Amino acid sequence: MYKRQLEVIEIANKACKDMGIENPRIAVAGLNPHCGENGLFGREEIEEITPAIEAAKAEGITGVVGPCPPDSVFSQAIGGWYDIVVCMYHDQGHIPLKTVGFVYDREKQEWKAVEGVNVTLGLPIIRASVDHGTDFYHAGKGNGNELSLVNAIKYAVKMTGRAN
């Protein structure tokens, strides 16, 4: 059944529109390698993801595409092809975000950049958070990096539609 996938596509569409994107370009990532290779590696793309995309289009969500290969859809989104990517599970979205936003200096053995922000859509409240977790390792040591927190706050403000 594709009910949950359709619901998430609808939530992604609404979130984009709420942030001023009139015609959102929504990529829906596949679950399996190579989007299942027509059922060879899994049937989720055939039985759940594609029907959800077709149902979304029937509802008038015309900018939705997929299933998109999960190993390349994020570089396409960063390149401007898509406004948002619907992922099939938590780490599918977090791995590319952290790969792009986290930079580690091996010589100094410290993080130079920790810029990821994650949001949870479909809640009755706005939720934006740092993408590095609680970071207890740096807590109380005075050596933390506030960039991700500042970015999360700025993004939450943007989500309200009140950003300047």
Map each language-model feature to its residues.
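Glycine-rich phosphate/diphosphate-binding loop of Rossmann-like nucleotide-binding domains
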Residues: 3-67
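Glycine-rich phosphate/nucleotide-binding loop
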Residues: 52-164
